[in-house]
Amino acid sequence: MQAPALAPLLASLAAQGVHTAIETCGAAPAENFALVAPHTRLFLFDVKHAEEEKLRAVTGADIAEVGANLSFAAARTEVIARVPVIPGFNHTEAEMEGIFRFALSHGVRRVDLLPYHTLGRGKYAKLGREYALDAAMLTKEDLLPWKALGESLGLDAGIGG
């Protein structure tokens, strides 16, 4: 997030009545969120995992930093947690429940589940790179049990978004 450059732009847009939104994974210094939050009406916040080791191994992110930024954003404006559901990474009941509880503990009330897809496979081939995750694409129907789980915990859960 390029917060020092983005904050004045967001402020100008917000002053003109333009709806402002930021998509983030939350792996950024807290001061960045402090700069942009006053001018942001919606954060689309990627939450990939709730286990520190798994999150760090795959994304390099610090779960404490992500959680602190998620809490900060949720206390100030609307936040939708977006959970990419990825086979072999976060696709078990325990992992999904952990993600939902993590989101709830940081003030999030809305979660959108995003089914894993392989749309980037062709780009990797053109770059001569291996597509690391060779798993089948998930459908909306595959995510219905996770949607029901999220709702049972008190979340407004959706698929897609």
Predicted regions mapped to residue ranges:
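Conserved AdoMet/S-adenosylmethionine-binding subsite of the radical SAM
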Residues: 1-114, 119, 125
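C-terminal accessory regions of radical SAM enzymes
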Residues: 94, 100, 104-106, 114, ...
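A structural motif corresponding to the C-terminal lobe/cap of the Radical SAM core domain
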Residues: 101, 125-149
